[in-house]
UniProtKB/Swiss-Prot annotation:
Pfam families registered for this protein in UniProt: GalP_UDP_tr_C, GalP_UDP_transf
Protein name: Galactose-1-phosphate uridylyltransferase
EC number assigned by the record: 2.7.7.12
Annotated NCBIfam families: galT_2 (TIGR01239), PRK05270.1-1 (NF003628), PRK05270.1-2 (NF003629), PRK05270.1-5 (NF003631), PRK05270.2-2 (NF003633)
Alphabetical list of InterPro entries matching this protein: GalP_uridyl_Trfase_II, GalP_uridyl_Trfase_II_CS, GalP_Utransf_C, GalP_Utransf_N
GO cellular component terms, A-Z: cytoplasm
Reaction it catalyzes: alpha-D-galactose 1-phosphate + UDP-alpha-D-glucose = alpha-D-glucose 1-phosphate + UDP-alpha-D-galactose
Nucleotidyltransferase in keyword set: yes
Keywords: Carbohydrate metabolism, Cytoplasm, Galactose metabolism, Nucleotidyltransferase, Transferase
Organism: Streptococcus pneumoniae (strain CGSP14)
Molecular functions per Gene Ontology: UDP-glucose:hexose-1-phosphate uridylyltransferase activity
Length: 493
């Protein structure tokens, strides 16, 4: 069977198109790929593989230029053929939701995979493993899924006239957007609309998912990230409306925030993070909120866990803690609320439902800098930045490291260095590599060396999180943490 015939057959079987539409669909494909593809045969069977072959044929026929951007634009246009229009996707979702919210979510997740919006083939390239630590097993990933632009495309992007449409990658206007060299193609993108606390929000999946069913909840309006009482209301509303999913927010200040601060959004999904499994190491009750179970969890960052069957109580208490933290200083442990009116304190909040109760984890954040730590006092320090120097956002806070692609080769190079196969490593890894070599001077087995290096990466990630923690895991640090808790007000009954 020809490539076009096979692709069109798949489109008909996996969409609302019918056999009568075959000629129409064939012509839609030829218009995008080029008529020279008509006689091309294929032995591929899967829809996404067929799409990929059509894209390569378009490059061969010079219908599109040989660039990553052109490939992505054509690929999303082809997959748009198997994707219902936004109104139909939303209608299907809410009709299914009326009978089973879980089924509605599952159907939308399956659609987002089937139409290649979630890049399963790319995500499969990621390296992922677990490492033991004093805080339980942590998750390490080396992110290889996001394609890196080649130098030619980066140069072209600099010459492209600035555009404010869409305003950012999280705006609703991305739905169906054609794409350009400096903005991703989104022809096959669909967003579920829903109302939350009186405003329109959107629900979509992340194309380059970091964990199972990684999704994004985005404000219908282009408004900046802001942690407030409304954040706690919305996060708890999400975990109630989207059963089985957690929901969390990045912090809203530089250094301790995420990569997108210009558009209010939350992340969620169906994944149990290491932090969720962390036990309470100290429990107490806050005054006026005696019915809310509260405590500090055993975690490298500073986390208060609140549990209750009352959303209202959790929202009120979380807001009280947040407001107190924003203005709280303790010079004995280098904690400062503001400098000349510039705030330093915020929270990374995470919500979930567990055993029928609502749960909020409030991670205390401080974005101060100093002469010794110009990148951030509570940010990965210089000696661990060879592994992780980016902001510690929501996902890392919960115990999942997202490490840069360079580490794939660099980890292997350090392992080769340990067994004497390589004489050099990257300059920024030299001290680390020498330290490992002195600890394991007689290593000859490359696989064993690789395991040692990967475990060491995990140990460094623990340090990264400890650096980001405002109250350290020391007697002084934990005593200071309790001073803050007492400042909020605990029940002495």
């Amino acid at each position: 069977m020809t490539l076009v015939d096979k692709f069109v057959t798949h489109v008909i079987s996996e969409s609302s198109f019918e056999e009568m539409d075959r000629i129409y669909l064939t012509n839609r494909v030829l218009a995008r790929v080029g008529e020279g593809v008509l006689e091309v045969e294929t032995n591929l069977d899967k829809l996404i593989d067929l799409k990929d072959q059509l894209v390569e044929e378009a490059v061969r026929l010079e219908t599109i230029e040989d660039s990553q951007t052109a490939r992505e634009i054509l690929g999303t246009e082809l997959m748009d053929l198997v994707t219902p229009c936004p109104s139909q996707v939303n209608r299907d979702f809410w009709e299914a939701y009326a009978y089973s919210p879980e089924q509605a979510i599952e159907d939308f997740y399956q659609l987002s995979q089937k139409n290649d919006y979630i890049k399963l083939k790319a995500i499969a390239k990621n390296i992922a493993y677990r490492v033991p630590s004093d805080y339980g097993e942590l998750e390490i990933t080396i992110n290889l899924s996001k394609p890196e632009k080649d130098p030619k495309e980066i140069a072209v992007a600099k010459l492209v006239q600035a555009s404010n449409y869409p305003q950012c990658q999280l705006c609703l206007e991305n739905e169906g957007y054609h794409g350009r060299v400096n903005h991703p193609a989104r022809s096959n993108h669909r967003i579920i609309r829903f109302e939350m606390v009186g405003q329109e929000w959107g629900f979509q999946y992340s194309p380059y998912a970091y964990f199972n069913e990684h999704c994004i909840f985005l404000d219908g309006q282009h408004r900046p990230m802001a942690i407030s009482r409304q954040s706690f209301e919305r996060l708890l509303a999400i975990v109630e409306q989207f059963p089985g999913y957690f929901a969390g927010s990045n912090a809203d200040l530089p250094i301790v925030g995420g990569s997108i601060l210009t558009h209010d959004h939350y992340q969620g999904g169906r994944h149990v993070f290491p932090m969720e499994l962390a036990p309470l190491q100290k429990t107490f009750r806050f005054a006026g909120f005696e019915q809310v179970k509260a405590g500090i969890i055993k975690w490298p960052m500073s986390v208060l866990r609140l549990t209750s069957d009352s959303k209202e109580d959790l929202i009120n208490l979380a807001d009280k803690i947040f407001q107190e933290w924003r203005q709280y200083s303790d010079s004995s442990v280098q904690i400062l609320a503001e400098t000349d009116g510039t705030p330093h304190h915020t929270i990374t909040p995470i919500a979930r439902k567990r055993d029928g109760q609502f749960e909020l984890d409030l991670v205390l954040r401080d974005n101060q800098t100093s002469a010794e730590h110009p990148d951030g006092i509570y940010h990965p320090h210089k000696d661990v930045q060879h592994i992780k120097k980016e902001n510690i956002g929501l996902i890392e806070v919960m115990g999942l490291a997202i490490l840069p692609p360079r580490l794939k080769e660099e980890v292997e190079q350090v392992a080769s260095y340990l067994v004497g196969e390589a004489v050099t490593v990257a300059d920024y890894h030299q001290e680390w590599a020498d330290q490992l070599k002195s600890q394991h001077p007689d290593l000859t087995d490359k696989e064993k060396a690789l395991a040692i290096v990967k475990d060491s990466v995990g140990a460094i990630f623990v340090r990264v999180l400890e650096d980001a923690g405002v109250y350290k895991q020391t007697e002084q640090g934990q005593t200071a943490f309790m001073r803050f808790v007492e400042q909020v007000g605990i029940s002495l009954d």
